[in-house]
Amino acid sequence: MASSAAGCVVIVGSGVIGRSWAMLFASGGFQVKLYDIEQQQIRNALENIRKEMKLLEQAGSLKGSLSVEEQLSLISGCPNIQEAVEGAMHIQECVPEDLELKKKIFAQLDSIIDDRVILSSSTSCLMPSKLFAGLVHVKQCIVAHPVNPPYYIPLVELVPHPETAPTTVDRTHALMKKIGQCPMRVQKEVAGFVLNRLQYAIISEAWRLVEEGIVSPSDLDLVMSEGLGMRYAFIGPLETMHLNAEGMLSYCDRYSEGIKHVLQTFGPIPEFSRATAEKVNQDMCMKVPDDPEHLAARRQWRDECLMRLAKLKSQVQPQ
């Protein structure tokens, strides 16, 4: 068995996100305890993790320096939450996106942890001020929001509660770096955090352009996959601005008026009408039929592409 000297991490919830976190922490040499209220869920999760990690090994994409068997030896299931958190340095909550359910879990954890363990949520949209309200250990609470699928997309948004201690943010940031993720700090909470605010802005305008007959759904997706997305896989929108002129100030001097003119033509928030949804769905189903088999195959293809992109990015060092 591999050494677990790196520390012990508890995963609360054994769904897709929970399993991904378990694999990531094991890749960093951490002992991982997977907790779920259903023993069968834990067994299923451990079997899925074993299969997934074996496939990653075969593809040469297993993270970390430990072998697949060493990593698997670090992951175990535990149906008792009090036993699971004993000796833990970090607890990552991964239950369904339901505020009351998550609050119940955190209240339970709050009553049994010490003053050293970090309580972290994987929520994609729930505000820390609501999620951690009233907890005794609120200074130890933080949101660490991964991007799906977390094993292939390294970004993690760190969002503190207004009373979260700076050391909690620093420790979580260091932990994410240690397991190969790319943490970024959200300085203060905002609805949707940062990633989803940007994503929803794109979805909003994409929907409007399709709804108004300006572009077909399939051509809209090409704009991202064969255009913006290729740049954004390596540099963000602000660096793109910086490079597309003689620096940021030059870009703003040249293009800000034109940008403002176009932005003024943007309409209100789309209603996401049924008629447009059916139009988009018809176009999407021509590419990927919406039955479980085709969707699963396409997701697997997506993950394989992300795996290859991650490999490429690891080989391309910034100048």
Swiss-Prot record:
Keyword Cytoplasm annotated: yes
SUPFAM superfamilies attached to this UniProt entry: 6-phosphogluconate dehydrogenase C-terminal domain-like, NAD(P)-binding Rossmann-fold domains
GO cellular component, one term: cytosol
Tissue specificity statement from the Swiss-Prot or TrEMBL entry: Widely expressed, with highest levels in liver and kidney.
GO MF annotations, alphabetized: L-gulonate 3-dehydrogenase activity; NAD+ binding; protein homodimerization activity
InterPro entries xrefs: 3-OHacyl-CoA_DH (IPR022694), 3-OHacyl-CoA_DH_CS (IPR006180), 3-OHacyl-CoA_DH_NAD-bd (IPR006176), 3HC_DH_C (IPR006108), 6-PGluconate_DH-like_C_sf (IPR008927), 6PGD_dom2 (IPR013328), NAD(P)-bd_dom_sf (IPR036291)
Top-level enzyme category: oxidoreductase
Residues found modified as Phosphoserine: 3, 111
Keywords for the protein's UniProt record, in alphabetical order: Acetylation, Cytoplasm, NAD, Oxidoreductase, Phosphoprotein
Reactions catalysed according to its record: L-gulonate + NAD(+) = 3-dehydro-L-gulonate + NADH + H(+)
EC number: 1.1.1.45
Keyword Nuclease on entry: no
Record: residues binding NAD(+): 16-17, 36, 97, 102
Modulation of this protein's activity: Inhibited by malonate.
Disulfide bond sites: none
Subcellular localization, as worded in the UniProt entry: Cytoplasm
Signal peptide per UniProt: none
Subunit structure: Homodimer.
Sequence similarity: Belongs to the 3-hydroxyacyl-CoA dehydrogenase family.
Described function: Has high L-gulonate 3-dehydrogenase activity. It also exhibits low dehydrogenase activity toward L-3-hydroxybutyrate (HBA) and L-threonate.
Protein name: Lambda-crystallin homolog
Gene field: CRYL1
